Structure formats: C-alpha cells, structure tokens
Amino acid sequence: MGKSKKQKEEMLAGIKQNLSESQLALVINYQGLSVAEITDLRRRLIPTGSICSIAKNTLMGIAVKEDSNWQPMEDLLAGSNAFLFLKNDIGGAIKAYQDFQKATKKTEFKGGVMEGRLLDKDQVKAIADLPSKEELLAQVAGAINNIATKLAISLDAVPTQLATGINEVPASVNRAIKAISDKEQQGDAA
C-alpha cells in the first residue's frame, strides 16, 4: 500500500529539513544492503552528527529542485539511493562511510553535492582528508601561543639589554676620561 499524500508531505518536509542543516550530501547505491547493515551505517554516522536516510528519488528530486545549492543532486537520482546528510564533522562522517564501505563492500558511491557543486569520489576523499574544525582551532591556538611565547621572551630580553647598556655607559665614560688623561700626560711629558 502506498503512502498517503500527508505522509509524503511529512517525508518531503523532513528531507528539506535535513538538507537545510547539512553542509554536504552524499548519494550512495544501497542495493544489496540488509536492514542490519543500513542500521550499522546509521550508527557509525551518529557520532559525527550525520544522518543516513532512504527516500524515493521523486521526493528527493522535488526537495532539491527548490534549492539551488542542492539542484546538482538531480543528476544522481536513479536507482536505489541512500542519502547521507553530513552536518557537523564532515571528515569524520566521510571516513565513517568509507570504513563501512570497506567492511561491507556492498555500497557504491555515486556522488555528492556541496555549495551547489557536484562532487566526485576524489573530491569527497580530499574533503575527508582535511583536518576537523577542532584540529584547525587547536593548530591556530598553538600558533598564537607560540607567537605570544616568543614575544614574551623578546620583551623580557629588552630590559636586560637596556640594563647592560646603562651599566656600560659609566664604564665607557670612565675609559674615555682615562684615555684623555693619559694622552694629556703624554703630551706634558713630551
């Protein structure tokens, strides 16, 4: 028995909600996966804040047609598709899918869409290899901390060098007076 119009409208609203919250959407062919395997994929995606959803291509087509950021996905809507909505940890979600794909060897990656662009397998893999947001923040914080440490060491050295210079002035004046005095004595003796 088919779904009622109201059920389809609710599913469409859910798809649109997932798209609006996602940074990247992947399309995979899930033909041959068991319910347990799809559940396993969904569990792997949970820690990354991502979702695996199975929807009819016609419903997904309606959802993406209304949003220019997702329109390129229309080219991928054929066959038995599962949709991965990647929201927070994109790299972690892609790696979770890749690990799942290696374990099952049953899914086929069809493509992805990000910021209105259709992405192939290599482009998605390149995104997965980027550091996570937390790693980037840690790198920036480390760089700022390193600069602050070097600045503190440099500023600490300035008073020391200034004190050495101030102490050297009287000694230099003393040497200059002595040299002048010695020169005058040599001039008197001659």
Swiss-Prot record:
Keywords attached to this entry: Ribonucleoprotein, Ribosomal protein, RNA-binding, rRNA-binding
UniProt-listed CDD domains: Ribosomal_L10 (cd05797)
Keyword Transmembrane helix in annotation: no
Molecular function per GO: large ribosomal subunit rRNA binding; structural constituent of ribosome
Keyword Ribonucleoprotein: yes
Example of a GO biological process term: translation
Pfam families found in the cross-reference section: Ribosomal_L10 (PF00466)
PANTHER family xrefs: 39S RIBOSOMAL PROTEIN L10, MITOCHONDRIAL
Role, per record: Forms part of the ribosomal stalk, playing a central role in the interaction of the ribosome with GTP-bound translation factors.
Subunit and partners: Part of the ribosomal stalk of the 50S ribosomal subunit. The N-terminus interacts with L11 and the large rRNA to form the base of the stalk. The C-terminus forms an elongated spine to which L12 dimers bind in a sequential fashion forming a multimeric L10(L12)X complex.
Family in the record: Belongs to the universal ribosomal protein uL10 family.
UniProt name for this protein: Large ribosomal subunit protein uL10
Organism of origin: Trichodesmium erythraeum (strain IMS101)
Gene: rplJ
